[in-house]
């Protein structure tokens, strides 16, 4: 966290620890509270501008009422929002959610940070992935009748908006066996049939010949 005066000079800098940070003896003037780095699972908060008058009163920009701490000191509150990622597994033809796929989110070090089986609703991950970091969506098992999809790389939005990732599955193509006729076998069959016809015809002629002798 940093506190800057109207000239952009840093008048105080600290790392939050879960307790209120106290800044004393601030001269009258305009100030900006900035978050330089957010904790993992959170996005960097919007800057807060406030003014301190000569009496020590604090007016926060766009805030009607200023909070006070337990000891009565003016309190400027900065709230961090969580990272939000929505992952959808869909049929590429219908665009409908596809249940039964086993999916993983993997970080750049190869660690599996989230694992689940898809359902009829998109999968939502909140406050677990790090803003601005790249992850890989991997399908390890596809639903029956579908092909495993290619991996998808995505980066978590750092502005507080929902990062939407869609992975499509295609149906496994049906394999048809083409007809591969064996010409040699066909010729042999026809030759045998022809030979049988010749033998039968010869027998008939022979028998007829004997009958009239």
Where are these regions (language model features)?
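Solvent-exposed loop/turn and edge beta-strand elements of beta-rich ligand-binding domains
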Residues: 1-213
């Amino acid at each position: 966290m940093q506190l800057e005066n109207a000239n952009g000079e840093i008048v105080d800098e600290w790392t939050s620890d879960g307790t209120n940070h106290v800044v004393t003896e601030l001269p009258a003037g305009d100030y900006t509270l900035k978050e330089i780095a957010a904790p993992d699972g959170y996005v960097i908060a919007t800057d807060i501008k406030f003014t301190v008058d000569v009496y020590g009163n604090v007016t926060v920009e766009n805030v009607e009422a200023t909070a006070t701490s337990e000891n009565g000191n003016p309190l400027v509150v900065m709230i961090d929002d969580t990272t939000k990622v929505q992952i959808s597994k869909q049929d590429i033809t219908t665009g409908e959610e596809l249940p039964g796929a086993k999916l993983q989110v993997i970080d750049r070090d190869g660690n599996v940070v989230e694992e689940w089986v898809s359902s009829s609703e998109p999968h939502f991950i909140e406050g677990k992935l790090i803003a601005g970091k790249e992850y890989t969506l991997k399908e390890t098992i596809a639903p029956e009748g579908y092909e495993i999809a290619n991996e998808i790389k995505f980066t978590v939005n750092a502005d507080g908006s929902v990062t939407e990732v869609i992975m499509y599955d295609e149906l496994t193509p049906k394999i048809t066996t083409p007809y591969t006729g064996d010409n040699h076998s066909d010729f042999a069959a026809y030759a045998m049939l022809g030979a049988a016809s010749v033998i039968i015809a010869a027998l008939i002629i022979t028998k007829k010949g004997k009958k009239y002798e």
